[in-house]
């Protein structure tokens, strides 16, 4: 017990030191209002208002293709999807209680971007065969995650393999030149377990009786999750997901045809073909220690990056480009004193960066937002529908 506390304090002071180092380096820091963060990896409020869960058994029997198919069928969820699955501008927006501000957590790590449509995670890139559970918390239940989860929380847990090896392959074809191949491989041997998936999707021109719309999409995404277990009490997990897409589509912009800068602009709509690309990668390393059935500690580091661009543009000197990166660290400790009383504490630090941004009107680079949290949360379940939270 003493060793555990010393380890927790050491990590705590290490993070505080790193905060001072970042400030000394001259990076722009934004201190937000105090926020409440929960360390509960699995919520015990199943069946209560504002909480919906699809477990592994339901996922296997539901004939789902991806995580988007699962989420859009949950009660109380309004979903607005834009673009083809995995497309250049594809995203899936969740509305809970009328708010579009939500947080996506995959295997304990926040996975959507802060700001713009990049905050709207594309769930269609996660194959259903990789999912162990999908949970949705409405705004009331998700408020413990802070202002970023005003609309709610979507919490996804991916599979850890059981004993043996299992491989599945799925091939699909359809209209508009659509082809899709999926492979999923799960295995466990002794203290090691792994899960691997890969998907490739191709789609061609859209056409109807009236017109044909030139377009092309070639998307590949894959992921691996490798876990080393130490008995029944601890495990170390490395997760890596990668996405790559190439696109051709018809888009438009507005060009100013007024040569005199002192006069109001005369905007003319231009429609043209463009090539586009998008790449993403997510890397996470987590260590989880279970001291007892009611006490656990999770420490992790993560990094996400995304690069999207139009390769061909009317203005070659200023193509549209967006390059983002997030790096973070968290340490969460939770102790359940009895079924209706849980104490949680920890630290979290993450840095969002705009490495490069360009469009026809502006150019921007090296923008950084640093978020830090040191929290202690005391939760009392007073009744089935009444919860008291102190922080």
List where the protein language model places each region:
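N-terminal periplasmic "start-of-domain" segments of outer-membrane beta-barrel proteins
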Residues: 32-65, 93
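Short strand-turn segments of transmembrane beta-barrel domains in outer membranes
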Residues: 158-187
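A beta-strand signature from Gram-negative outer-membrane beta-barrel systems
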Residues: 125-168
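Face-selective signature of the C-terminal outer-membrane beta-barrel domain
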Residues: 229-244, 272-391
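Periplasmic-side early beta-strands and strand-to-turn transitions of outer-membrane beta-barrels
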Residues: 155, 163-164, 184-276
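Short acidic/polar hinge/loop motifs at secondary-structure boundaries
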Residues: 93, 110-138
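Extracytoplasmic beta-strand/coil segments of soluble accessory domains associated
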Residues: 68, 72-110
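Structural signature of outer-membrane beta-barrel domains
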Residues: 42, 111, 174-176, 201-205, ...
């Amino acid at each position: 017990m003493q060793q555990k506390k010393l380890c927790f304090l050491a990590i705590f002071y290490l993070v505080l030191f790193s905060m001072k180092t970042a400030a000394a380096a001259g990076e722009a820091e934004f201190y937000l209002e105090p926020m409440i963060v929960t360390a509960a990896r699995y919520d015990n409020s199943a069946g209560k208002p504002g909480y919906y869960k699809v477990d592994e058994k339901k996922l296997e029997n539901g004939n789902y293709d991806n995580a988007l198919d699962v989420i859009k069928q949950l009660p109380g969820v309004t979903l607005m999807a834009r673009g083809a699955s995995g497309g250049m501008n594809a995203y899936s927006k969740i509305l809970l209680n009328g708010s579009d501000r939500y947080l996506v957590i995959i295997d304990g790590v926040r996975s959507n971007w802060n700001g713009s449509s990049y905050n709207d995670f594309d769930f269609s890139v996660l194959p259903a065969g990789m999912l162990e559970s999908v949970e949705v918390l409405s705004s009331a239940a998700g408020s413990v995650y802070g202002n970023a989860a005003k609309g709610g929380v979507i919490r996804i847990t991916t599979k850890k393999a059981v004993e043996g090896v299992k491989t599945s392959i799925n091939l699909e074809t359809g209209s508009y030149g659509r082809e899709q191949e999926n492979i999923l491989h799960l295995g466990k041997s002794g203290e090691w377990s792994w899960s691997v998936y890969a998907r490739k999707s191709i789609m061609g021109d859209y056409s109807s009786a009236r017109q044909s719309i030139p377009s092309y999409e070639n998307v590949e995404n894959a992921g691996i999750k490798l876990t080393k277990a130490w008995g029944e009490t601890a495990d170390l997990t490395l997760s890596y997901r990668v996405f790559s897409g190439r696109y051709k589509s018809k888009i438009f912009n507005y060009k100013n045809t007024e040569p005199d800068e002192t006069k109001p602009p005369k905007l003319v709509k231009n429609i043209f073909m463009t090539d586009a690309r998008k790449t993403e990668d997510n890397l996470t390393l987590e260590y989880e220690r279970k001291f007892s059935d009611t006490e656990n500690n999770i420490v992790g580091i993560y990094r996400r990056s995304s690069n999207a661009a139009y390769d061909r543009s009317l203005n070659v000197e200023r193509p549209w480009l967006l390059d983002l990166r997030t790096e973070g660290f968290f340490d969460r400790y939770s102790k359940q004193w009895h079924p209706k009383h849980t104490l949680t504490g920890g630290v979290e630090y993450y840095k969002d960066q705009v490495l490069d941004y360009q469009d026809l009107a502006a150019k921007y680079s090296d923008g950084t937002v640093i978020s830090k949290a040191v929290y202690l949360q005391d939760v009392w379940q007073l009744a089935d529908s009444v919860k008291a939270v102190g922080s």
